[in-house]
């Protein structure tokens, strides 16, 4: 009887060792595949960044920020008008899109919650979040540009704002939902009106998270080309008239990169480097703001 028990124990131990060996093998295979996939993705990311830096750094100069876009096959010149135009488009898109997104997020988190209207808004917002930017550009072209019968900076602002609003809505709603409900109950117990509770308590508690969403939304629209091709188009001259086509960096990069002129291509690489650095800085700033809110 003792011999049978010893054999059974030995068989169980051997079975356990084989099972553990198989698990270790599967774990090594999964880890190797994960590391290989990560290395593959990082390789291309680093390659793209290095190509952008090495090719774009040659075109960086003071003239890039002070001179206008040059005529074809002409040395010198810069991207001053394109940079100014992009700044105007992003500024106005943020001015119009951010308040709308914040107010919609407040409604979803504080007023609508699970109402049918809130569900409809969330559904539409999810569609806008996943919609290709060129679809938004075509939509604005149909309802604005085609009706006005000319391209304009305001059409570009509308397109960029439509891309920005869904991000701000989602971030605002999520940040407000993270505020403990006990704070709301305490405010109600003191007789605080709902609008006062929202402005003085929930918004104040989630302001860093909302700011993070706004920064990410700005980074999202900073390099968009497709919607601007159908709305603001471009302008090779210095112009701040939002009722007319206005120069902007993404479309200028697209135009110069597709050209056969080496001077334009060099400016295009410099423009790509500027956009890359701006988006990188915005993402870093967003992470810093969010981390400060999380640990502060």
From Swiss-Prot:
UniProt keyword list: Cell inner membrane, Cell membrane, Membrane, Phosphate transport, Transmembrane, Transmembrane helix, Transport
Q: Which GO terms describe its biological process?
A: DNA damage response; phosphate ion transmembrane transport; phosphate ion transport
What name does the UniProt record give this protein?
Answer: Phosphate transport system permease protein PstA
Q: List the Cytoplasmic topological domains.
A: 1-28, 103-126, 170-204, 287-296
Q: Name one Pfam family in it.
A: BPD_transp_1
Q: Determine if Electron transport is one of this entry's keywords.
A: no
Membrane topology term: Multi-pass membrane protein
Please give the family membership noted in the entry: Belongs to the binding-protein-dependent transport system permease family. CysTW subfamily.
Q: Could you state a single Gene Ontology molecular function term?
A: phosphate transmembrane transporter activity
Q: Look up the record and report any one GO term of the cellular component aspect.
A: ATP-binding cassette (ABC) transporter complex, substrate-binding subunit-containing
Please explain the role this protein plays, according to its UniProt record. Part of the binding-protein-dependent transport system for phosphate; probably responsible for the translocation of the substrate across the membrane.
The reply on keyword Transport is yes
């Amino acid at each position: 009887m003792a011999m049978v028990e010893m054999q059974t124990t030995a068989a169980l131990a051997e079975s356990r060792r084989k099972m553990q060996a198989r698990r270790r093998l599967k774990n090594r295979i999964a880890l190797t595949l994960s590391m290989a996939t990560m290395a593959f993705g990082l390789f291309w990311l680093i390659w793209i960044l290095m190509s952008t830096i090495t090719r774009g750094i040659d075109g960086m100069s003071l003239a890039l920020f002070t001179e206008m876009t040059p005529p074809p096959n002409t040395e010198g010149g810069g991207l001053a008008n394109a940079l100014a135009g992009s700044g105007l488009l992003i500024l106005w898109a943020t001015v119009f899109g951010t308040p709308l997104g914040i107010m919609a997020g407040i409604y979803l988190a504080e007023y609508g919650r699970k109402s049918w209207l809130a569900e409809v808004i969330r559904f539409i917002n999810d569609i806008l979040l996943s919609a290709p930017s060129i679809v938004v550009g075509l939509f604005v072209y149909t309802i604005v540009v085609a009706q006005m019968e000319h391209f304009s900076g305001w059409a570009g602002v509308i397109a960029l704002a439509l891309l920005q609003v869904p991000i701000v809505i989602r971030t605002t709603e999520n940040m407000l939902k993270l505020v403990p409900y006990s704070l709301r109950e305490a405010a109600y117990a003191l007789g605080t009106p709902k609008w006062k509770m929202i402005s003085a308590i929930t918004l104040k508690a989630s302001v860093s998270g909302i700011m993070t969403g706004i920064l990410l939304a700005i980074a999202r629209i900073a390099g968009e080309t497709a919607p601007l091709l159908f709305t603001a188009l471009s302008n090779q001259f210095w112009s701040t008239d939002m009722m007319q086509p206005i120069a902007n960096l993404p479309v200028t990069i697209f135009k110069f990169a597709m050209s056969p002129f080496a001077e334009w291509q060099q400016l295009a690489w410099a423009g790509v480097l500027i956009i890359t650095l701006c988006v990188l800085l915005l993402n870093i700033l967003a992470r810093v703001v969010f981390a400060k809110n999380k640990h502060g």
